[in-house]
């Protein structure tokens, strides 16, 4: 927080606006642009690692028709592990403090939606399409690659969207283990007294929330683009029925 922002007013919201409008806070080394690049790079690496782990397992279990309980167990166990606890424990291993430990911890957090949606996507494939493919002599691997996987793409996109938004929002905790990212701005604000650092804390929170919403919006468009129109209509009807059930209408 600059001295100018601190003098401009005691309202932390006003201080946050001034801080965000200071060009030096964007362009200086360790400024917003640098932290944004760190945040995006480690989030992308974590989601990619989660995909490499979760998608093959989910697709194969969905193809085999077994392991639904295992998918549920893995999802529940990984969701039950606090990300902050992982960020605290992993740096004490061979990964050390810094980016690798952060990426692994965030990847664990990304696994549940990726795994569950991969499994569900394959299981929801049209049984008639499966039977027709088997009738054409396709092997199990060919059936998965040529029939089930293309039909599962909308579900994979939905899982990717959920995982990416969760990881981007949670990556702010990386600053606690010297991982960088936008959370470093918030942490630096807490290092100042509240009168001087309150605006910087709010500004950092706004940046993290804004980035998460931007990722959500972009990936929502991608998910819509890869989802066939009939499936979009079916999901819309299901969502309306669920909303009606909740409201009692």
Question: Predicted regions span which residues?
Answer:
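Transmembrane alpha-helices
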Residues: 44, 140-174, 203
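Short cytoplasmic-facing helical segments at TM-TM junctions of multi-pass membrane proteins
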Residues: 117-157
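Periplasmic/extracellular loop-to-transmembrane helix junction in inner-membrane transport proteins
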Residues: 2-47, 194
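Membrane-spanning helices that line or support transport/gating and their immediate boundary helices
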Residues: 59, 117, 121-124, 128-131, ...
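Transmembrane alpha-helical segments of polytopic membrane transport and secretion proteins
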Residues: 1-19, 30, 217-249
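Loop-to-helix entry region at the N-terminal start of transmembrane alpha-helices
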Residues: 31-42, 91-113, 153, 200-204
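Hydrophobic alpha-helical transmembrane segments of polytopic membrane proteins
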Residues: 182-223
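Cytoplasmic-entry segments and transmembrane alpha-helices of multi-pass inner-membrane transporters
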Residues: 57-90, 106, 116-120
């Amino acid at each position: 927080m600059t001295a100018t922002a601190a003098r401009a007013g005691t309202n932390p919201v006003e201080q946050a606006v001034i801080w965000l409008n200071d060009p030096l806070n964007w362009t200086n080394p360790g400024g917003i642009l640098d932290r944004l690049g760190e945040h995006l790079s480690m989030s992308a690496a974590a989601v990619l690692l989660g995909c490499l782990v979760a998608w093959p397992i989910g697709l194969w279990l969905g193809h085999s028709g077994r392991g639904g309980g295992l998918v549920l167990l893995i999802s529940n166990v990984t969701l039950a592990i606090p990300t902050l606890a992982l960020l605290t424990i992993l740096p004490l291993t061979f990964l050390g403090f810094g980016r690798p430990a952060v990426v692994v911890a965030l990847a664990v957090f990304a696994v549940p939606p990726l795994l569950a949606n991969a499994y569900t996507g394959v299981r929801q494939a049209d049984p008639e399409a499966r039977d027709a493919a088997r009738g054409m002599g396709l092997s199990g691997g060919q059936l998965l690659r040529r029939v089930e996987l293309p039909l599962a793409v909308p579900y994979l996109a939905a899982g990717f969207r959920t995982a990416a938004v969760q990881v981007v929002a949670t990556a702010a905790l990386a600053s606690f283990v010297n991982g960088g990212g936008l959370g470093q701005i918030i942490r630096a604000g807490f290092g100042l007294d509240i009168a001087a650092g309150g605006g910087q804390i709010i500004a950092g929170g706004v940046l993290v929330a804004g980035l998460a919403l931007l990722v959500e919006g972009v990936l929502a468009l991608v998910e819509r683009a890869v989802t066939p129109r009939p499936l979009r209509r079916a999901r819309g009807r299901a969502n309306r029925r669920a909303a009606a059930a909740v409201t009692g209408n």
